[in-house]
């Protein structure tokens, strides 16, 4: 059973109103000091049953004024096992999952044993190249000349965001890995992706 909670920011605002009416001393952002435990009581009801089945919880938190350090998203980040940070990408005009601000405490378990052996290396290479594109975009905005590599990372980032990070994308893990290999092959040389040669030999799109 999947439980979707929306919007936890509104819930916290309601807690703040009740707390103020009770003349309790507010904490950061006028939120009651009990916010952490109030949220934990809800989020930590997620459970996996020994006999099978689970109750996962997905909570939606709207950022107050776009501030990720606000008390609600800040406390949520400490309690939950991971967050998907959504933002609008102006380059492709879609809402995407931001890989830099998203977090998974389970990511270290991606070893390729339950998915595909190239999974961890493809994941790390894609994020590194996407970060290189962000640096190239900063250079361009500041009026610096771009190298050929910079231009290729920018083109890669647009396709990567459109084909993999956009929230309207619906692919399984194998399909995502194959699409990413296709983008690697389209924009880079094998040595630029910094992935083991045996994996490159197996998956590089000729």
Model segments located where?
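P-loop NTPase catalytic core
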Residues: 1-205
């Amino acid at each position: 059973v999947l439980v979707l909670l929306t919007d936890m920011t509104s819930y916290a605002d309601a807690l703040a109103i009740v707390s103020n009416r009770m003349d309790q001393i507010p904490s950061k952002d006028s939120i009651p000091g009990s916010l952490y435990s109030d949220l934990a009581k809800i989020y930590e009801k997620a459970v996996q049953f020994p006999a099978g089945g689970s109750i996962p919880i997905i909570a939606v938190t709207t950022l107050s004024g776009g501030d990720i350090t606000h008390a609600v998203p800040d406390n949520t980040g400490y309690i939950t096992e991971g967050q998907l940070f959504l933002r609008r990408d102006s380059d492709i005009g879609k809402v995407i999952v931001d890989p830099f601000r998203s977090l998974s405490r389970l990511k270290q378990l991606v070893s390729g044993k339950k998915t595909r052996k190239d999974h961890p290396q493809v994941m790390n290479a894609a994020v590194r190249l996407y970060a290189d594109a962000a640096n190239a975009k900063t250079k361009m905005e500041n009026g610096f000349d771009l190298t050929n590599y910079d231009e290729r990372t920018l083109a890669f980032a647009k396709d990567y965001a459109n084909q993999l990070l956009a929230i309207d994308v619906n692919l399984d893990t194998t399909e995502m890995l194959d699409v990413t290999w296709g983008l690697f092959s389209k924009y880079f040389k094998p040595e630029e992706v910094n992935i083991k040669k045996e994996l490159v030999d197996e998956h590089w799109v000729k």
